Regions:
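Signal-transducing alpha-helical linker
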Residues: 20, 24-27, 37, 83, ...
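The catalytic core of metal-dependent phosphodiesterases that act on cyclic dinucleotides
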Residues: 132-206, 218-236
Length: 236
């Protein structure tokens, strides 16, 4: 149970009676499927700002779920089970659709939508989302798809193919949690991207840590050399 400034209660599902991962996943699968059917998923919109761009009204979207009693469940609790059981493509498309609806109602300049490795391999994704945005009478530039650095590194070829397909339709592409592995330079060289989102761990205590300052400066310079914009994670 967690309470923020608006006193939103975050619920922890009791899985103590389910001892194995398979048994626990069975509980989560049932909850996720019922949430999809009963409209108990919703997005949280987190304002973000580029370190270089003058764009305003940009948001990072995160999905959350409510149980049948209305208790809120964080994505870190239910997404792992969805990933293990082939539900991520369905969830990703729900999130994308909800993000497009948000843009249509709010007129946000851009929303950042993270997609899973399952959706990276979804050859119909780019065409599907382009039609979705067209139906909403929005420019494709409102959506920036993002993939974590480690996922992109593990799925280099399909990630490059998807980034290229999305770019052909006018969508933006970003790598998040950037800079925490040795793959950063290689990703910048081999992947087509519009943004990097420097991992929050590098931003914490930045003002007093010269090693972090040097690394962040290097990442920003590498990105700038390739005309890639930089966003800092977890900076308030």
């Amino acid at each position: 149970r967690e309470e923020g400034g608006d006193k939103v209660v975050v619920h922890k599902v009791d899985l103590t009676s389910a001892t194995s991962t398979k048994a626990k996943d069975a509980v989560w699968i049932k909850l996720i499927k019922s949430a999809l059917m009963e409209n108990r998923l919703h997005l949280v919109h987190q304002p973000i700002a580029s370190l270089q761009s003058q764009e305003n009204d940009m948001y990072d979207v995160v999905v959350r779920m409510k149980d049948p009693r209305g208790n809120e469940i964080l994505p870190g609790d239910f997404l792992p089970a969805a990933q293990r059981n082939g539900l991520m493509k369905t969830l990703d498309r729900w999130i994308i659709n909800a993000a497009v609806q948000f843009c249509a109602s709010r007129r946000a300049s851009r929303v950042f939508v993270r997609i899973s490795s399952d959706s990276i391999a979804d050859h119909g994704l780019a065409k599907w989302v382009s039609q979705l945005v067209k139906n909403a009478k929005l420019p494709t530039s409102v959506i920036c798809f993002q993939v974590p650095e480690d996922v992109a590194a593990e799925n280099m070829l399909p990630t490059q193919e998807l980034a290229q397909q999305l770019g052909e339709f006018g969508f933006s592409f970003a790598i998040e949690h950037f800079g925490i592995s040795t793959n950063a330079g290689r990703l910048l060289e081999q992947l087509t991207m519009d943004y990097i989102k420097i991992d929050g761990s590098l931003m914490q205590g930045l003002a007093s840590n010269e090693l972090k300052q040097t690394k962040v400066r290097s990442l920003v310079e590498m990105a700038r050399a390739r005309d890639v914009q930089t966003i800092a994670e977890r900076v308030k």
